[in-house]
Amino acid sequence: MPIGVPKVPFRSPGEGDTSWVDIYNRLYRERLFFLGQEVDTEISNQLISLMIYLSIEKDTKDLYLFINSPGGWVISGMAIYDTMQFVRPDVQTICMGLAASIASFILVGGAITKRIAFPHARVMIHQPASSFYEAQTGEFILEAEELLKLRETITRVYVQRTGKPIWVISEDMERDVFMSATEAQAYGIVDLVAVQ
């Protein structure tokens, strides 16, 4: 039996009465976000709007993005990454569970020195994928060119944010490379591994 979204008590500063809000709204008010699903346009737009709203509300208090995602749509993930770089507050990224594919790209986009992985978290990087089998020949060529541009952009960001040479990133993106939390720290994707 599903329990739905739990409700928790919340009292706004200066108000005497406590109201019950769903847990996600309560966490958003504390500047905590969760990417706990495949990255798509809907979750991307939700996270972007929350980051922008809260950065306007208070631009000096950090935002926290908890990630447990298998990846998803590249463009939607890049939009989240770009917003993280655009907003004034630092965005701390915390990997819990899995940050794979474009989710690892979002993870590496956190504020330098403020990217964390839980001890048993896993990180996976690889090159962007496509649905070539559905395309006609002309579309296939255009899609391949676009995919190559996206791969170059993603590679440059990983190089910049991890400090790894371009040849290492390019080689590792040829296949699925899974890392433990400590391996992701050594690689430069995260800065700290949370202690148990």
From Swiss-Prot:
Q: Where in the cell is it found?
A: Plastid, Chloroplast stroma
Q: Which GO terms describe its molecular function?
A: ATP-dependent peptidase activity; ATPase binding; serine-type endopeptidase activity
Which named protein is this?
Chloroplastic ATP-dependent Clp protease proteolytic subunit 1
Enzyme Commission number, as recorded: 3.4.21.92
Q: What is its main location?
A: plastid
**What is its induction?**
Repressed in darkness. Slightly induced by high light stress and during cold acclimation (at protein level).
Name the tissues where it is expressed. Mostly expressed in leaves. Also detected in stems, and to a lower extent, in roots (at protein level).
Record HAMAP family: ClpP (MF_00444)
Q: Which Gene3D superfamilies does the entry mention? A: 2-enoyl-CoA Hydratase, Chain A, domain 1
Query: PANTHER family attached here?
Result: ATP-DEPENDENT CLP PROTEASE PROTEOLYTIC SUBUNIT, CHLOROPLASTIC ATP-DEPENDENT CLP PROTEASE PROTEOLYTIC SUBUNIT 1
Q: Name one GO biological process term.
A: protein quality control for misfolded or incompletely synthesized proteins
